[in-house]
């Protein structure tokens, strides 16, 4: 009786708690979202189940506990009947409670509370039913048996059949379950573990290099006692002083003083060379200085130029390197042309001698490029050559030697010209911008004056043909005219400066007969003609001619030079195709173009014209001379 009262009180308490939880949920119905984690937590909180089984005490003996047959025999009919009875009672109790409570709530939190209360009521009904039998009392506590497993599965399956969840919540739970199953099927953790193993396998193990063990009884290699600097007894010898190694100069200076005129391509004792020296001396006796030079008309001049042609007999390689200077012997009997090369050679070619190979003689009076070359106007038997090596030499045919006229080992020379008509004094330009006055009548090979100019570099020097006290210099970007009478060693200012140039100037020359014109060749691809008829503070610019002067580093720079027979025409090489040599008038008109066909296939950077005859010689960067003549 007391047991039934206690059960009734517990039932009443559980109903009150259930009612409080339902009311508590109703107060929170306006919440935007309710988590379902509490439902899962409520279902999983059950850890121990108590089951009352009918048990008979008639066969019980003292000191012995015997399980009923229905529990020992798993296949007995009583066990199956008990399971079916339990399932039926659970379903009935849950259905009855849910029917009365689901009308007032639709939330997942209330459903979890109802699930817990229904399980509690089911347990109480079973206890009351089993306690009503007076001769049966059974207490079973099972946490790990197969019967509890079956009851858990049955309870879970019964909970799955609940229809209290809304369709949205059912769909949400289904999606969560499907997503969890999908990610589990991907086996991401296993893939990550495999990748981690692969990365770890790729790293090679650090292996320490084993040091070779030295053999104790290893015999050393034999060594030279001379290299060890010891004597046979093992005593060290005194250290011998080492001599400094001398670096061979690529272009060593030739010894000072006169040099013998020995041809490098011939035997100096050959009959041909002796005949050549004799011919040179004979033709030099005939002087052309008394011949009057008359300026022909432009029409006549063009007609004479048209008759000048080139052939294979007038093309020959005279020097070993590029040609830097060319000069004609003034003889009208023989055609003798001289060329100064980059290698320091000076070549002489007698075009009247056949075969042409026998008329070429090559000498080595310098060790560096020969940039300026002239035959003496007073004595054509003298050939003067100036080189970068700082020497100015005179080749004398009568004595067959190259005399040293001027020597300066501190500065490189660039150009020179004759200050006096008798060729006794010279004006010499240096690459560092200084100017030297040299007098051949003074013993020795030194200068009379050394003047520092305002130019940083001097490329060419040229003396006025009439007023010989004036000379013009071409520098980096300026062209200056000086008066030789006003030169002082401390420094001299130019009389006039031609500032129209924008880039470096290759050359500047007075016109050959009167000196009334000046022509300059500039790297800005322009030829400029100035009016120098009056040497005053201003020299006006007359004409500018566009002409390509960009030769590059492998070709000698182009220079425009005057034709000695014509006061108003200049000759210059061309970069145009086909290769040619052009003649321009001071007005800018192109007077003539010398085309050679297959005989002229290179650029003739350096050109010269015979002073009295219509003969043109052009030198290229391989040492060849191309001659156009009537």
UniProtKB/Swiss-Prot annotation:
**What SMART domains does UniProt report for this protein, alphabetically?**
WD40
Segments of skewed composition (Acidic residues): 145-155
| Keywords in alphabetical order | Repeat, WD repeat
A GO molecular-function descriptor: DNA binding
Offer one example of a GO biological process linked to this entry. Answer: DNA damage response
- The UniProt entry annotates WD repeats at 318-359, 365-405, 408-448, 453-492, 500-540, 542-572, 598-630
Instruction: Report the GO terms under cellular component.
Output: heterochromatin; nucleus; site of DNA damage
Locate the compositionally biased regions of type Polar residues.
Answer: 105-118
Residues of the region (Disordered) are 105-165, 199-219, 231-252
Does the entry feature the keyword Repeat, yes or no?
yes
Q: What Pfam families does the record tag this protein with?
A: WD40
Q: Which family does it belong to?
A: Belongs to the WD repeat DDB2/WDR76 family.
Q: How does it assemble?
A: Interacts with CUL4A and/or CUL4B.
What is the role of the protein in this entry? Specifically binds 5-hydroxymethylcytosine (5hmC), suggesting that it acts as a specific reader of 5hmC.
Name of the featured protein: WD repeat-containing protein 76
